[in-house]
Amino acid sequence: MAETTPKVKGHVVILPYPVQGHLNPMVQFAKRLVSKNVKVTIATTTYTASSITTPSLSVEPISDGFDFIPIGIPGFSVDTYSESFKLNGSETLTLLIEKFKSTDSPIDCLIYDSFLPWGLEVARSMELSAASFFTNNLTVCSVLRKFSNGDFPLPADPNSAPFRIRGLPSLSYDELPSFVGRHWLTHPEHGRVLLNQFPNHENADWLFVNGFEGLEETQDCENGESDAMKATLIGPMIPSAYLDDRMEDDKDYGASLLKPISKECMEWLETKQAQSVAFVSFGSFGILFEKQLAEVAIALQESDLNFLWVIKEAHIAKLPEGFVESTKDRALLVSWCNQLEVLAHESIGCFLTHCGWNSTLEGLSLGVPMVGVPQWSDQMNDAKFVEEVWKVGYRAKEEAGEVIVKSEELVRCLKGVMEGESSVKIRESSKKWKDLAVKAMSEGGSSDRSINEFIESLGK
């Protein structure tokens, strides 16, 4: 008897903010929905559309007003881009939704990146349900919401610390998202993007956060209900091969704006002993201030550890004189790599990271101990949780009175996660969180149930 095609349970449009750190979790969520028989169309900018290569996903280009120009080029203005994307994106997204109205698969729901709150306006104008997808963790979202609502004054005042939200750990000034604190005056446009996520967020039908049950367990509240943002946890949104393995051949995100160097990395790692390599990566933007870049290099040089460093070619020329030559027998420098593939390799002993949320979730989900060197945005908060809440590594501390982590501190942290009794305890904690991540995404797990509940709501 011929197999029947499973009934499609609805049609969803996903609207991501077009940078790598937002594409990854939202495209992964799209694939997860498709695996559960939901039709998904990704609406993304003309420049970004060709980077999404997953066969099971339909990709439709919409205009941000720049079309063939990437975000982040010299002279790029976040404010100008935001206005242009709102104007052009709203119009072209509406036309896309209209196009499907007359087909046998009209749109049921728009899942929009929280950085694009105008997505809710489009959804409502087209009489669709709407879900806002947050790519930060729940704590960061809750803190930013307080600033957006005026509960905490802007910019954050160091003398007002600690910053408390009922049900969440208190935060020092340096643990706040930096764009409402130390970087508010120098990067106000980034702060505005973060705060603009919240004025209309409670009007959405769903608020999705890329986290999982137990990860940010709120503390007991003596004085009433937790003040954390009410959201549905649907993560970790990383490829299934590294979690529940229920999605066939799901080994990467299927969306890359950069070309990874995979074969060379894997061949090099195969020559190293188990848990002997420090993997060093500071994200798709690769942001390290020049003085910090030098301190990282000195630490790697003095640590005597094997290391694989993802570093832009332009930054290699800024490394201390003699660094490349003196470390060539135990180092591999590449411009980009498949980070999950590297983290999953048995030779990796720790992850020296900026603690962007995607990278932090990947480290947790694969059970890799971490050393956090946060630079800006939400990274300070994530690094705090790495050390104090999850106990899976260390946050490298800045030198007193300076915005820089010295090489001596980095060596201390690297040795702490790679050697001795401290490394044993950290590895035990890392395994615990890895197991919880797998459980959340497995059949009947907390995140799996939440995704199923969303699917059941489609068309109702």
UniProtKB/Swiss-Prot annotation:
One of its GO terms (molecular function) is thiohydroximate beta-D-glucosyltransferase activity. It catalyses: (Z)-2-phenyl-1-thioacetohydroximate + UDP-alpha-D-glucose = (Z)-desulfoglucotropeolin + UDP; a (Z)-omega-(methylsulfanyl)alkyl-thiohydroximate + UDP-alpha-D-glucose = an aliphatic (Z)-desulfo-glucosinolate + UDP; (Z)-2-(indol-3-yl)-1-thioacetohydroximate + UDP-alpha-D-glucose = (Z)-indolylmethyl desulfoglucosinolate + UDP. It holds the Pfam family UDPGT. GO terms for biological process: defense response by callose deposition in cell wall; defense response to bacterium; glucosinolate biosynthetic process. Induction: By high IAA concentration. GO terms for cellular component: cytosol; nucleus. The active site is at residues 22, 113. SUPFAM superfamilies: UDP-Glycosyltransferase/glycogen phosphorylase (SSF53756). It is an enzyme of class 2 (transferase). It comes from the Eukaryota. Keywords: Glycosyltransferase, Transferase. Disruption phenotype: Plants are severely dwarfed, partially sterile and display decreased glucosinolate levels and increased IAA concentrations. Its EC number is 2.4.1.195. Belongs to the UDP-glycosyltransferase family. Involved in the biosynthesis of glucosinolate. In in vitro assay, may use phenylacetothiohydroximate (PATH), but not phenylacetic acid (PAA), indole-3-acetic acid (IAA) or salicylic acid (SA) as substrate. Specific for the thiohydroximate functional group and does not glucosylate the carboxylate group or a hydroxyl group. This is UDP-glycosyltransferase 74B1. It comes from Arabidopsis thaliana (Mouse-ear cress). The lineage of its organism: Eukaryota, Viridiplantae, Streptophyta, Embryophyta, Tracheophyta.
